[in-house]
Amino acid sequence: MTLMNGDGAHEHQAEAEPKQNGHEMGDQTEEGNEQEVIVIQDTGFTVKVQVPGVETFSIQVSPQEMVQEIHQVLMDREDTCHRTCFSLQLDGNVLDNFAELKTIEGFQEGSVLKVVEEPYTVREARIHVRHIRDLLKSLDPSDAFNGVDCNSLSFLSVFTDGDLGDSGKKKKKGNELEQIDCTPPEYILPGSKERPLSPLQPQNKDWKPLQCLKVFTMSGWNPPPGNRKMHGDLMYLYVITMEDRHVSITASTRGFYLNQSTAYNFNPKPANPSFLSHSLVELLNQVSPTFKKNFAALQKKRVQRHPFERIATPFQLYSWTAPQVEHAMDCVRAEDAYTSRLGYEEHIPGQTRDWNEELQTTRELTRKNLPERLLRERAIFKVHSDFTAAATRGAMAVIDGNVMAINPSEETKMQMFIWNNIFFSLGFDVRDHYKDFGGDSAAYVSPTNDLNGVRAYNAVDVEGLYTLGTVVVDYRGYRVTAQSIIPGILEREQEQSVIYGSIDFGKTVVSHPKYLELLEKTSRPLKIQKHTVLNDKDEEVELCSSVECKGIIGNDGRHYILDLLRTFPPDLNFLPVEGETMPEECTKMGFPKEHRHKLCCLRQELVDAFVEHRYLLFMKLAAMHLMQQKASIKDVLGTEASTASEQLEGNGPSEEKEDLDLDGEAQLKQLEETMAAHKETVDTRSKEVILKACQAVGSISNTSFDIRFNPDIFSPGVRFPNESQEEVQNQKQLLKDAAAFVLTCQIPCLIKDCLDHSVVPMDGTTLAEAMHQRGINMRYLGKVIDVVRKFPVPSQLDHIYKILISEVITRSAKHIFKTYLQGVELSALSAAISHFLNCFLSSFPNSVAHLQSDELVSKKKSKKRRNRNLGNTDNTAWANTSPQELWKNICSEAKSYFDFNLECENVDQAMEVYNLQKISLLREICIKVGIQILLKEYNFDSKHKPTFTEEDILNIFPVVKHVNPKATDAFHFFQSGQAKVQQGYLKEGCELINEALNLFNNVYGAMHVEICACLRLLARLNYIMGDYSEALSNQQKAVLMSERIQGVEHPSTVQEYMHLALYCFANNQVSTSLNLLYRARYLMPLVYGEGHPEMALLDSNIGLVLHGVMEYDLSLRFLENALTINSKYHGVKSLKVALSHHLVARVYETKGEFRSALQHEKDGYTIYKNQLGEQHEKTRESSEYLKYLTQQAVALQRTMNEIYKNGSNANIMPLKFTAPSMTSVLEQLNIINGILFIPLSQKDLEHLKAEVQRRQQLQEAIKGAENHEAKTKEPEMSETSDSNINAASVAPESSD
């Protein structure tokens, strides 16, 4: 495991000591949680390490970690990094690599560990060579550009000049403003039309790495002949030093030495001198002075980099642009390409990894207490990320034609593959399996539905029920499903294996008691109803899943379920069924619509939201009935239930959460409890109340709220017995209600959240996230656009409209690109992709595919048919596509898939009509389909030559969907921490979130998107509690992590840059703060364009900092732009606009332009007066400032008159033009970034402070009575009560 969340020091996370009681986390109260936190805190200790040839040094370790982790630290340290083959000894005993430190006898504070060099084996020698190669390449970004080995890019250090922690000390002189160059580049100024691409990946000065060797490669004399093996030769290396010396090196069991071989003569005898060294680096230091100098300098640089810049990410991130990287000779990479990996991971003695066994064994680990759960989750997560990487490599090998099919005689589309113990199949409808469901379209969507099912069952995590490791890879237009292999499944026919479910969509169905028992446990969390279907012999068969879900017992005796594509109920808005009428809300909006396949399912988030909505309604109804009974109005009950169900259908989000009658609700809770206790004697009336409420909301039970769906309803070919007809009718109604719920509740909810800016999408990815969180599928895009267009003030949703349209265009283009690519063979890929991009984005009217390659293809076509060309099209058909034709297809795809009419015939019309920009569309399409293009400036608008040439297409990457295993305990701590923060207990919140961070690190390693959220919130809390340097350190990690895991221009990364800029400013690092803001100001228009609501906040930040460094004209450009954007999205009378006016007024005042300043402050004052009233603090402040400005203006006028009258003899009073103090700038920055709670008046604050202090004194008194420590607690108390007043400030942040 690599470095944890420390800055290069070996700070390992505290891991959990076993808890006293082994209860599940879920059963714990909050007190329980806090109890647990205290137990987990774990003290590290210091040990000394003795290494041959290096002075003894100390490192910090934790009792929880393994010996192996000390190995890892030594391989990372500057002075010991070149050693790999050693053991650690304590008092002469060799330590087991996998032993936990706490289990080692006599291992304690001050122990001395000895590093002892061990003899090499072939495997150890390979590991050593690979490690040295990694050290030589440690600053080289090519692996990140090529998307290899979980490397990814980060550019933060370019804008901070290295690590912020250290440079903070150097840059403390932030007040000497003369040294700061504040001029932003032209292209980031408001209103600039220029969108350059090159600055996206600035050249890092470390990237011209110091070259240590010219060539370092395996020798052609490998492997050693038998007699040399018996002398201990393991392998031979060939090196050319920078001094042009050619040397041949033997790796032997004792180490490395020079031999006498040349390129053409084999002479394995040691050279004279042979310099036998245990490490390759020590040998090369002797041979080459340049190597010695440069290697040392390189390692110094490597360890100075922030660990987060170099730690591998759990899943590979691909970059859509890259500069021209020189292709250097690299022996390890060359060997990797031609052999199965022999590195750390892949090489388990004698075999490739048995993925299925690993995936299932990790699930079987015990989970009684926290340490066990952490260990289990860490193992699950690690194996999943390894499996995903292997599956991705395999899928690419399959499509590139490098894997032999297991059924080679069949047609290409029908072939299946096994590679590295993973089974691969292609997303085509083979053997008409999906004929009734939409053929190839259904076969294409089925793997993702299946993956969603696997996700859901994995999350429920029932003991004894197993799913397959599943990864879905889209690559070069093909969809490949990769699955782990059930032991024994390949030896028998599917018909014999399946003991539960159906292999023919419900004609023959079987069931099995053990499967029913296991699936029953998942049915409540997944809301699946147990139901009965008829098989082909009209026998009743009981199921607890959809019929397609198959149960197979493997040869390992485990119960597997597979084909989970119908885990969630069908979406009736896209499944017209004869003879069924949909609710009026659906028909009014034009549903149901015919879709290209019949596998449209509701998302799990939608099912959960729908059930939650029904539960609120159930409580409301029951409470209402109870109140009525109390008033003895029994006769109203009948009509009430019916109006309730009517009300239910039309319930919009506005009515959804009315305050329930608390009295009634309390009674209902009581009623539920008494019913459970005395089933017989319960008052029949109370039963009736619950029964009525249950019936009205569609609960499957009559005594409690329980809503479940039957996933087989509306499945063609599935029949139900007669006695369950009523139940089936109820289920149909429930599905119709759920379909209506998407349209009447969830889509309006999304729009409302966009309006009040609680969700602010900036690109396709963030839009999809927002829709998916609310359970809205992307096929509803057209409907969402309709709703947005009909909004009363459409301009307030401009940003959403623009992203929606861009998403419809790029997704339609993606669908077309997929089939387009299937007809292209490997040698023509670059030409075909550049031709497609030209047709899609270039203004060049007659884009013709590049002729040379076109001729090549047609001449060679006959020979090349053996390449995996799964499309039925002619290999050169792609070359005939024209821009007109492509855009016509995009428009028809948008209509048929999203039911949206695009009003454009070519790219330039689309840009004009919908106010889009080509660079953003280019980014979207590249990310969606995995294209990587050359980093350079593209001229999209030239009418004389096409935008892209085939040299511009650098690579095509896979787009991978996989399961994301969760760190559940850590997540609970994180949520409790957020809750505490929102209640205003910052200190307690901070402790819980720190604990969550430890646990996240434990499970995920150092890099993960959830750790990123954790660090962001911690930084915010540090900042609010006044610890600016800690805030800076945590936020720096958050930025690095966001760049590495989500992408350098992902909207979240842009946000992280803005937070970091604020903390830099607070730490007096003004120029760094500006650099970071300028970076964000470059990225946002690239991703979205000008005029996004978030741009107002960004421009206000930039304007304020520029004001602080006295760049008044520049400052005004940004602040006035922010004012315009705020007025557009929040309305001209909003408080945000008032604040914008005030900020602009302040700058005009410092410029001495009092008339403009007065005008803006008056506008602000009017808003405050109308919104908050005359007595509000804000209104009064504004009024005071107006008076001051008026006085200044009068003074100025008087001076001017004096000058006019008396000319140069005038006796003038000097005017006060004061530059703003940094403190006042920081105050304003805090306000606009939501760090202070604006609308609270002074009186409110005092009330709040008194209340907080009263509560804390109460708490302290209780604690004091228990601990007799009242005295020591007092100072701490007053501190926290102060910080609690700012609590409101974190609420908006923590919600994300």
From Swiss-Prot:
GO biological process, alphabetically ordered? intracellular distribution of mitochondria; mitochondrion organization
PROSITE patterns documented for this protein: CLU
Q: Where is the composition biased (Polar residues)?
A: 1278-1296
Keyword line = Coiled coil, Cytoplasm, Repeat, TPR repeat
The protein's matches in InterPro entries, at most eight in alphabetical order, are given as: CLU-central (IPR033646), CLU_dom (IPR025697), CLU_N (IPR028275), CLU_prot (IPR027523), GSKIP_dom_sf (IPR023231), TPR-like_helical_dom_sf (IPR011990)
Q: Per its UniProt entry, which superkingdom is the organism in?
A: Eukaryota
Q: Which family does it belong to?
A: Belongs to the CLU family.
What name has this protein been given in UniProt? Clustered mitochondria protein homolog
Origin species: Xenopus tropicalis
Gene of origin? cluh
